[in-house]
Structures are given as C-alpha cells and as structure tokens.
Amino acid sequence: HGLMDVPNNREMTRDNVFIMMSSTKPVLGVAAMMMIEEGLVRPSDPVSKWIPEFADMQVAVLADPVEENISPVSVNSNNLPAYRLVPAAREITVHDILTHTSGLASGGLGSAISNQADRRPPANLETTVPKFGGYVLDFQPGSRWQYSAATALDVIARIVEIESGLPFDQFVQQRIFEPLGMSNTWWNVPPEYQDRRVVIVDRDMSRFFDVPDTTYFSGSYGLNSTADDYLRFEQMLVNGGELFGNRLLSPRTIRMMASDQTNGLYQGISRRV
C-alpha cells in the first residue's frame, strides 16, 4: 500500500528496499547473544578484555558544583558548559553496552566533548572502534539508561568479529540472514536493486543513495532490507529463536532479551520491552 517514491508517484511493492536505520540494532543483539550462548562472551565481561583502549575511561561532569558530579542528559557540542573529568567508577561491560547503560556516546556532555574529535569517515570496525575508548563517557557506567544511537553497539560488533574470526557483515550473513532466507538484506545495496529503494519524503536522499559502498559494517545502523525479509527476522524472535526449522537462539535466550535488564530503567537487550 502507498507510494515508495511520492514525487514520482511510484507505488510501493513487497520487494521495495527500506533504509533500516536503528532496526540494525536487533540484528546485532542476536549476534551478541549467539556469542553469549556459545560461551565466548559473558555479559559481565569488561570491554577491555578485547579492546584495551576501554580500560581507563573518564566521565564528564559539570564544573560546578564541585561537591557534586552532575552529568547533564543533553548538551549541544557547539555550546559546551564548563566541565571537568572524573574517572569512571568501573569499566564498561558488554551488558552495559547492550542495555544502553554504558554512558558511551549517549548524547550527553561526554558525547559533546568527544564530538570535537576526529570526524573522518570510519574505515572499518577494527581500526575505528578502539578510538571510542578515548571518548568521554556521558555518565557513570550502569547509573542511567540513555540511548546510544550510532556508536556504542559497534563495540559489540567488533567483539563479535574478534571472537568469530569473521567480519561482522559476513558473520550475520552466514549465521542470521542465510538461515532465515533473508536474501534482500545488506549494508551495501547491489546495483541491480537500487531502483527498488524507498525514497523518504522531504529528505535529501543523496546522503543515503549517492555514496560509495561502505566497509564499516555498523551494529547500530546501516542495514537495508525489505518488509518480507525483516518480517522473517522478527518472526524468528516471536517463535522463540527458530524459523523454518533453523534455530538461531534458544527460547530461554529470547526471553532474556525481552526481559528488563536495567532494574526498570527502560530496555531489554537491544529490544524495547
């Protein structure tokens, strides 16, 4: 129903390709839980176990009052308040990142400070993710829930790469997309599918369409897919981790993903409760 390209009056069809944006995150969540089920990763593991740059992070707080460490929820990087840095009370863990409670790139004061740093396009997870260890945290790990739109979950994607020995895109292709029959889901849309891409109304689509293929396979954003393909992924979750006789995760793991992981702060593991 509807139009896939309003200005040109082109009708929507079942094979149209959508920009999935943050619907990439549940795919990362399934990949992470595969690592956990296989005993390669524990939620309580510090990220520095794989990426040493995350060992000694700092948290941004307002300069005043000095007797309190206040981390504001939202800050404009072009209008930074006076601030100071304090040591993180503990290292951030896999669980912190999966539940958006790490303080990494969550839109607060630390993010505003970190946004002043290198803004060159990322090359790949291997070379880019260690740089995130130099970012300033928005709040003390585990003390708050605050959504990380485009950075934190890439750390988990890199851990999946390290433990699996595969680039993240190849891992999800082999372990998730192929078993589910998701043949129309990619980070880089093949040339023969370009004319099927849905045009977002009143948006400059050149930033999505007129770009070279990426080598940075984010766990936070970037996938393109069809409604039919993504329905297969969601149906697997509804079915308790299985579709077409192919089991990706155990029912127990799926229940864990959908349960409150933050003592009421907000989310499950990469899925909204």
Model feature map: region roles:
Residues 17, 22, 84-87:
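Short gly/ser-rich anion-binding loops that grip negatively charged ligand groups
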Residues 28:
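Active/ligand-binding-proximal structured segments within catalytic/core domains
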Residues 1-20, 40-42, 56-68, 208:
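Short, conserved catalytic-motif segment at the N-terminal edge
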Residues 46-273:
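Short, surface-exposed loop or secondary-structure junction motifs
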